[in-house]
């Protein structure tokens, strides 16, 4: 493969809902670029893009796969991104390295929730889009409905460049109002006839052409003047105006195609090459806020957007050349570690195929192998240049489960395997919770986690069990209570003795501090000698006040008392959960000149706290999440009813671009496998986000149940 200059490169990500036909479209693009002589199909499990075994088993894209074709003297790099919300991380990483997107819409389904989600991501990353209405050869293809939904969702941006002739099983061509031609296809291999527009379609073509001209003129004052002067624009002028509109995010040009029959694919590629953005037009923002122009004259830098482990190659780092000219054997500096990395081999990538190349210009996408620290989000740059690019920010997790090896002997092996998988897929989060004493695996949905399980068992040979994780409850109090506890132990020689009297009260936001209380029926003012305040790592506060007078307890034992309190804060008296938002006053006690020591006061403080806590109106608190659901309106009732059964507090409903949006506060305990539940309720048509909000007291019946479960567990462990 020859080296292409930056201006002759186009980087395009294919995005859209699952089953919109992106992989089939990518296969047709490779066929048009003569990369392959015969197109594969998802059903036959022989596409270039879906080359991983798990993708063949599921017959869907799971990973974002880089591909390329050499077409019209241009390097046409394509990343086929997964359409399922569960695998959104692959699409997000592709947004970082592509200047253009093709939004693929299934003509049978029209604009789906997933369509809107991907369009929003593209808008967030300022990624210009071209729209490809695919599967126009399908029995239920509905062009008019799809266009109407696009206008409802995207407002004034959609503009028709092509419209189909005979949509449905007999679909064999379209009218292109930019070219003012009728493109007729004689077979399923993209063989095209360029014909005059039939008389019965000319009025529609001329109307749409005029709309296209007016839209193109909107984005350039000079073109607007020409339009007013001449009443029309040339094909090149229309393309120029559309190009500016695409760059400004103000227009969505709509194309017709059937990826399966290779109808319209070549024309889509032609338009993309002539109109879309080349890397030479772009600048990339570094961590320190500077901009680096994507050209060969700047210091060489690459950004790693994806990592993988592949048979016979080991660890593979996929990158974009952000600036400069990358050559085989070049030494670059790792922006994270400062270490030098040598790129002993570089490759152009088309699915599983890696073609070794001697160099890649700025703007190119490629891969290398066996870097020491070539992880996702790492910048490698010319020695001394100091270039480090902003990280990809991946979406928050929406699914969590606990995981353990089937055999305890495999726990170490499991940990190593999970570490490798999470390095390859940053949307897989693995953490060991000291609080829950469980390994928690988080991802985008149950399908995402199931793929992780498949990889663990088939690629790493570790059989695993996945199950509902424990909930990180919190414990607190609602009123004042006191307790005195004496720890005394005699066993010959020096014994143990420590007595502590404490008062505890809740810390409530907005309620001022007080040191006036009623103890044993008497009004008492506790004089504070010293105080310590702690922001707890699990949330909330602990305030510790030494109010002991008359030398009842030496100051040297106060740290031991505080340690005893902290011990019980990390293992609350009700369910063993972390305690929070408690103010503790140590106001009296006793000590022994010989037997008192640190351990005595640690134990006395722990037991005094436990006793006082149980008398202070103790409450269990649960984590609450803000949940936002986007769904077709037909499913709103089912979604709301389901949430109400999950103890949710509905906060609002609204309409957004043709979809219904439901906002609610939901206990985490009710959200296990919610992505699966929502998919079942809506036939996979809805999506949701969840974000931690705060902690709230559980209802009385839930607290009773949790206390009983904890008591049974304690008894079982005795």
Predicted regions and their residues:
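Structural and coupling elements of P-loop NTPases
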Residues: 1-718
């Amino acid at each position: 493969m020859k080296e292409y200059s930056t201006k002759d490169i186009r980087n395009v990500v294919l995005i859209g809902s699952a089953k919109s036909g992106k992989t089939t479209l990518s296969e047709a693009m490779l066929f048009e670029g003569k990369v392959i002589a015969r197109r594969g199909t998802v059903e036959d499990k022989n596409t270039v893009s879906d080359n991983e075994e798990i993708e063949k088993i599921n017959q869907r894209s799971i990973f974002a796969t880089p591909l390329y074709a050499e077409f019209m003297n241009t390097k046409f790099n394509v990343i086929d991104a997964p359409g399922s919300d569960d695998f959104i991380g692959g699409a997000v990483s592709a947004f970082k390295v592509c200047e253009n997107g093709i939004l693929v819409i299934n003509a049978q389904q029209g604009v789906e929730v997933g369509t809107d989600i991907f369009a929003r991501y593209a808008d967030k990353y300022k990624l210009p889009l071209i729209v490809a209405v695919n599967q126009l050869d399908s029995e239920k293809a509905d062009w008019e409905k799809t266009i109407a939904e696009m206008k409802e969702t995207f407002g004034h941006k959609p503009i028709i460049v092509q419209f189909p002739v005979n949509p449905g099983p007999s679909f064999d061509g379209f009218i292109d109002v930019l070219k003012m031609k009728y493109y007729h296809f004689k077979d399923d291999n993209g063989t095209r006839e360029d014909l005059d527009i039939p008389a019965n379609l000319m009025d529609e073509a001329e109307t749409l052409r005029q709309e296209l001209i007016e839209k193109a003129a909107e984005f350039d004052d000079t073109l607007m003047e020409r339009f007013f002067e001449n009443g029309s624009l040339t094909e090149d002028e229309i393309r120029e105006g559309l190009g500016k509109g695409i760059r400004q995010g103000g227009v969505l040009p709509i194309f017709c195609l059937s990826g399966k029959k290779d109808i319209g694919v070549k024309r889509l590629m032609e338009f993309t090459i002539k109109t879309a953005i080349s890397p030479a037009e772009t600048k990339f923002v570094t961590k320190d806020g500077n901009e680096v122009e994507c050209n060969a004259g700047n210091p060489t830098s690459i950004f790693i957007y994806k990592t993988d482990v592949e048979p016979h190659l080991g660890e593979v780092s996929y990158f974009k050349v952000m600036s400069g000219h990358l050559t085989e054997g070049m030494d670059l500096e790792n922006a994270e570690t400062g270490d030098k990395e040598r790129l002993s081999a570089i490759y152009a990538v088309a699915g599983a195929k890696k073609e070794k190349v001697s160099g890649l210009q700025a703007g190119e996408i490629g891969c290398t192998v066996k870097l020491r620290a070539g992880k996702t989000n790492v910048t490698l740059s010319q020695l001394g240049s100091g270039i480090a690019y902003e990280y990809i920010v991946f979406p928050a997790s929406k699914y969590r489960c606990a995981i353990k090896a089937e055999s305890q002997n495999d726990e170490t092996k499991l940990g190593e395997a999970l570490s490798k998988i999470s390095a390859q897929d940053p949307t897989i989060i693995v953490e060991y919770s000291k609080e829950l004493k469980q390994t928690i695996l988080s991802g985008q949905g149950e399908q995402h986690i199931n793929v992780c399980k498949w990889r663990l068992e088939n690629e790493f040979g570790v059989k695993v069990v996945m199950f509902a994780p424990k909930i990180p409850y919190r414990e607190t109090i609602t009123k004042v209570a006191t307790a005195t506890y004496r720890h005394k132990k005699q066993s010959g020689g020096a014994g143990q003795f420590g007595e502590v009297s404490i008062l505890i009260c809740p810390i409530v936001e907005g309620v001022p501090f007080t040191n006036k209380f009623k103890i044993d029926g008497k009004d008492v003012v506790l004089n504070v000698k010293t105080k310590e305040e702690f922001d707890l790592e699990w949330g909330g506060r602990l305030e510790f006040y030494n109010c002991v007078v008359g030398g009842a307890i030496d100051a040297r034992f106060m740290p031991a008392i505080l340690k005893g309190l902290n011990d019980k804060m990390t293992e609350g008296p009700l369910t063993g959960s972390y305690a929070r938002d408690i103010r503790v006053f140590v106001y009296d006690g006793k000590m022994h000149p010989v037997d008192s020591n640190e351990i005595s006061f640690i134990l006395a403080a722990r037991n005094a706290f436990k006793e006082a806590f149980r008398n202070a109106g103790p409450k269990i608190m649960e984590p609450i999440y803000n949940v936002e659901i986007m769904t077709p309106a037909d499913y709103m009732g089912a979604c709301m009813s389901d949430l109400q059964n999950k103890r949710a507090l509905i906060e609002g409903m609204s309409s957004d671009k043709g979809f219904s949006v439901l906002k609610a506060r939901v206990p985490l305990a009710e959200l296990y496998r919610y992505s699966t539940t929502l998919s079942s309720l809506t036939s996979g048509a809805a999506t949701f986000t969840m974000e931690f909000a705060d902690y709230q007291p559980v209802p009385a019946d839930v607290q009773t149940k949790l206390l009983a479960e904890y008591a049974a567990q304690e008894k079982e462990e005795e």
